[in-house]
Structure formats: structure tokens, C-alpha cells
């Protein structure tokens, strides 16, 4: 007698979840964000693939961690579904019902680019006058950006604090004076090779002008080295 063994085969379907991170959730660290998402995926009852081993958990990866306190409007995480026949709206609804209000899923797509291709990030930096008026803030910040070099102390993995010139890392910049703030859109290196945090420019401003400016930073988008938006 021949014993027939049947094996259930799943077709894993990678999908990219797009979400915003705002309000109180801006202050959730990347590690805590991972925990929040893990709980939401578990509660959502979505048919997703779990890692194997002693402690199986939903498989999820994030393209590029967002700095604490930053707002993100095009954040992504990748999961794997156990079936390639999925309903985008059902996934969005199921996750939003399990996530805190500061994290909002708005789209589900198939991954086009690998996270390792990310090389640039576009930030919106809003500066609010505190000890000086708006005109002076605008004048001072543009003066800072027009300097031949902008020297700051930056943490490195091997050498601790190191003085670097961040001026050459500005890929694009635009500064405008709004009704209540100075708005700066800045394209900076980001990804696995080089990362320049926009708060370094805030630190340079505060040190140069002995100020303690109020600011809000939003990451608007990330790109590959050809300037193509991450998809």
C-alpha cells in the first residue's frame, strides 16, 4: 500500500503598504512602530505569511526608518500575503481598524523598487520665529545656507562625534517666507550609504545665531539615485 502525502502550497504575494505617520505617532520610535504594526497585523486577521522558527511572527519590513518627531506622508512597509488574490480596500480597512489614529494606511501596491535603491529623501522644514521676527529668521537661515561650508558635529558608528561639512550634501533646496514660518524644501542623501538628517541644519543655525528656533519636519518622499520616486 502506497501512502500518499499531500502538501499545502501557498503562493506568497509581496505587497507594499503605504501609510502616513503624524500627530502623537510622530514620537513613536522605529522599534515601537514595528511593535505597533506587528500587533495590528495580528489583530487584522489578514492572510499574511509569518516567519518560521521558535517565535513565528508576521513578516514585515520598512523601506527607510523615519526619525523621531518627523511627520511622514509616504511611508512604506512590505508584507507577504499567502494568496495573490487580494482586495486592496479590505487590507486598508482591516489595518486602519487596528492601528492608532496617527498612523493611516492609504494605499496597497505591488513593490516595484527594492528598499536598497533608496538614495535621497525630500524634507519640508518649517521654522517658526521665537526670539527673532520672521524677516530676520528668513534672512539668517538663507545666509546660513549660502555659506561656503556648514560645519556640524555628526554621530558616526565608528568614531563617535565627528565634525563634517554638510553643505555639499544639499542636493536641492528652496526657501520661502510664509505667513507664520520660513518653509524650506531640502533634498538630502538618504539610504544605506549616506544619511544626512535635516536637524543638522537646525543645529548649525542655532549655534551660529545663538537661537533655539522652533521647527517641524516632514519627510515628503524618497527617491533612487536617478531621482525617481520610490515605488
Per-region residue spans from a language model:
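Short beta-strand-to-loop capping motifs
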Residues: 19-21, 79-85, 125-131, 186-190
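Extended, well-folded interaction surfaces typified by the phenylalanyl-tRNA synthetase beta subunit core
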Residues: 13, 18-20, 24, 28, ...
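N-terminal amphipathic/basic-hydrophobic helices that include classical n-h-c signal peptides
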Residues: 1-10
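Ordered, amphipathic secondary-structure segments that act as subunit-interaction surfaces
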Residues: 73-126
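Core RNA-modification/binding signature centered on pseudouridine synthases
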Residues: 146-231
Amino acid at each position: 500500500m502506497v501512502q500518499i502525502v499531500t502538501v499545502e502550497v501557498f503562493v506568497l504575494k509581496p505587497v507594499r503598504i503605504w501609510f502616513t505617520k503624524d500627530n502623537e505617532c510622530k514620537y513613536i520610535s522605529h522599534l515601537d512602530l514595528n511593535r505597533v504594526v506587528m500587533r495590528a497585523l495580528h489583530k487584522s486577521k489578514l492572510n499574511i505569511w509569518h516567519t518560521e522558527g521558535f517565535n513565528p511572527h508576521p513578516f514585515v519590513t520598512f523601506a527607510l526608518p523615519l526619525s523621531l518627531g518627523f511627520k511622514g506622508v509616504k511611508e512604506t512597509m512590505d508584507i507577504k500575503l499567502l494568496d495573490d488574490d487580494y482586495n486592496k480596500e479590505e487590507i486598508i480597512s482591516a489595518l486602519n481598524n487596528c492601528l492608532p489614529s496617527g498612523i493611516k494606511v492609504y494605499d496597497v501596491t505591488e513593490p516595484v523598487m527594492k528598499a536598497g535603491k533608496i538614495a535621497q529623501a525630500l524634507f519640508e522644514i518649517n521654522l517658526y520665529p521665537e526670539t527673532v521676527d520672521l524677516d530676520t529668521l528668513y534672512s539668517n537661515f538663507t545666509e546660513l545656507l549660502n555659506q561656503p561650508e556648514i560645519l556640524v558635529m555628526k554621530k558616526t558608528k565608528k568614531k563617535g562625534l565627528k565634525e563634517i561639512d554638510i553643505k555639499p550634501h544639499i542636493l536641492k533646496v528652496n526657501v520661502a517666507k510664509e505667513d507664520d514660518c520660513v518653509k524650506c524644501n531640502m533634498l538630502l542623501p538618504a539610504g544605506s550609504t549616506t544619511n544626512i538628517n535635516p536637524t543638522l541644519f537646525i543645529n548649525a543655525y542655532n549655534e551660529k545665531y545663538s537661537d533655539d528656533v522652533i521647527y517641524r519636519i516632514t519627510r515628503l518622499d524618497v527617491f533612487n539615485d536617478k531621482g525617481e520616486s520610490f515605488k
